[in-house]
């Protein structure tokens, strides 16, 4: 979280200090605005009766969404660095190392949750719902598409619409 929307406001000594150049801050805002809008478009609960649909709050969850994306990218790099000496392991149960990496990430965030709790968490929790931590995050990561040979489909996000914060 040291380089998310909150952590970036602190310098190397932990003091709140605007240490970024104006250009860096502007570029960060452009990228994070895209991520906020991606999450804002996620319907977490459909309209029901006279109740409108409930949408994810990309601004509320921005720091965590940045951390999820950054953590995935760093851990993926670490995984591949571990292959340098011994090579990439053989597929297991038909899944490559990259596929198992992303399947493991998705498995972590599985939830069984009631609609009332989804509505509450969407309004107060800085973390995106588990489903969105997986689907919305992975949509921006090229190596995910490569791992599964994804070229189009409902969850496909065209390359020009993807955003990588770090």
Language-model regions: role of each:
Residues 1-166:
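Zinc-dependent metallohydrolase catalytic domains
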């Amino acid at each position: 979280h040291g380089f998310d929307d909150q952590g970036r406001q602190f310098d190397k000594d932990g003091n709140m200090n605007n240490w970024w150049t104006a250009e860096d801050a502007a570029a960060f805002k452009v990228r994070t605005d895209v991520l906020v809008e991606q999450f804002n478009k996620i319907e977490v609960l459909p309209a029901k009766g006279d109740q409108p649909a409930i949408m994810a709050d990309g601004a509320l969850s921005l720091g965590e969404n940045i951390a999820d994306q950054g953590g995935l990218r760093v851990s993926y790099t670490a995984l591949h660095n571990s292959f340098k000496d011994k090579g990439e392991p053989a597929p297991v149960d038909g899944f490559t190392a990259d596929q198992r990496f992303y399947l493991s990430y998705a498995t972590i965030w599985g939830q069984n949750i009631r609609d009332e709790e989804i509505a509450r968490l969407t309004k107060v929790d800085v973390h995106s719902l588990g489903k969105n931590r997986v689907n919305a995050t992975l949509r921006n990561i090229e190596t995910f598409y490569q791992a599964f040979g994804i070229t189009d489909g409902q969850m496909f996000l065209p390359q020009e619409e993807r955003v990588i914060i770090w």
